[in-house]
């Protein structure tokens, strides 16, 4: 992101975001890639939107027997507070974080997803 300080633009890292690594289905990642292209966004923003909507619901149903077999490592960033809330939610639901992340894909609202250029926003410093 950029900050406007004394009339000058200064590039800074967004300190509210946290990097994380997880293992999710390759099929889901491919679907998210296509969705992000269609809606001019990033996979991380799509997932973040799904997390928010799922947490607002407060509960999910997940069958551990139907876990995907094609999980691969995936790295992205997310709002740090949101990621912590997601981890707590996974513990309360007695699920792995990977399972909760995959379930959140069903809660993505593409009308409310951040644009790909959000990371280049200008904030007043």
Feature roles, as predicted:
Residues 1-70, 77-81, 88-125:
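A detector of short terminal or domain-flanking linear segments
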């Amino acid at each position: 992101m950029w900050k406007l300080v004394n009339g000058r633009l200064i590039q800074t890292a967004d300190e509210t975001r946290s990097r994380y690594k997880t293992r999710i289905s390759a099929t889901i990642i491919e679907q998210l890639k296509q969705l992000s292209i269609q809606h001019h966004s990033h996979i991380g923003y799509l997932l973040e939107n799904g997390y928010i909507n799922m947490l607002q619901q407060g509960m999910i149903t997940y069958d551990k027997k139907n876990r995907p077999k094609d999980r691969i490592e995936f790295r992205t960033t997310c709002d740090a507070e949101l990621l912590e809330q997601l981890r707590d939610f996974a513990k309360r639901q007695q699920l792995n974080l990977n399972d909760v992340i995959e379930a959140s894909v069903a809660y993505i609202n593409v009308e409310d997803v951040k644009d790909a250029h959000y990371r280049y926003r200008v904030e007043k410093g």
